[in-house]
């Protein structure tokens, strides 16, 4: 009985360690340094926009780039909604660039790289949700390397709904994380994963 109990405890601890490890693996963050732009990509636009705006107000970059279209062609692009939030928070419109046509993270990366090249920018801080940061970083790194001369640093959005240690204990965190893991697996396997 004692061996069973000890085995159960060790097994449960191992499973919890793996689940916590997954959260920490997805939530990639680099040391903050000043850049030419702060890029927030669509998805959970509230937390992402708020984090990008806070970084802009702290002087990390002179330009905000909001990237993301709308799933409904009749509605306003996510990037435009983030811009409105930033302007309402006191960011001057001339300190904001909008890319409102991308529908996937891969398109975010390509269109942001185009925008940065067109403006002569070379460095960015990439802001997205913590559970999305790893996959976004892979896609942005591929695109930025392909275009040459572009660099970015990861800075996950402050997201009170997602905890890297406890994501597996409740929804929607659990669902978001599992979907993200599936997309990351598809990306690593060489399939398109948004």
Predicted regions located by residue number:
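N-terminal type II signal-anchor transmembrane helix
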Residues: 1-29
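Hydrophobic alpha-helical segments, especially transmembrane helices
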Residues: 3-4, 49, 184
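Enrichment for repetitive, rod-forming helical segments
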Residues: 9-10, 55, 142, 190
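Structural signature of transmembrane alpha-helix termini at the membrane-water interface
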Residues: 18-21, 25, 52, 185-192
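Charged, low-complexity, helix-prone segments enriched in Lys/Glu/Asp/Gln
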Residues: 18-23, 45, 174-183
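A structural signal for short, hydrophobic/glycine-enriched beta-strand patches
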Residues: 23-169
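A transmembrane-helix-recognition feature enriched in membrane-embedded lipid enzymes
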Residues: 169-194
């Amino acid at each position: 009985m004692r061996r069973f109990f000890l085995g159960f405890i060790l097994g449960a601890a191992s499973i919890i360690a793996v689940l916590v490890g997954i959260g920490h693996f997805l939530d990639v963050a680099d040391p903050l340094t000043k850049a030419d732009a702060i890029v927030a990509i669509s998805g959970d636009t509230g937390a992402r926009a708020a984090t990008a705006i806070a970084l802009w107000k702290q002087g990390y970059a002179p330009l905000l780039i909001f990237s993301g279209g709308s799933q409904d062609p009749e509605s306003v692009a996510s990037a435009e909604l983030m811009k409105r939030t930033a302007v309402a928070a006191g960011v001057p419109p001339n300190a904001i660039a909008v890319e409102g046509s991308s529908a996937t993270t891969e398109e975010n990366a390509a269109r942001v790289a185009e925008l940065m090249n067109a403006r002569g920018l070379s460095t960015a801080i990439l802001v997205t949700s913590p559970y999305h940061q790893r996959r976004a970083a892979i896609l942005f790194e591929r695109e930025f390397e392909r275009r040459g001369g572009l660099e970015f640093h990861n800075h996950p959005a402050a997201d009170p709904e997602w905890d890297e240690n406890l994501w597996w204990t409740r929804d929607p965190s659990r669902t978001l994380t599992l979907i993200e893991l599936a997309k990351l697996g598809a990306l690593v396997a060489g399939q398109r994963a948004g």
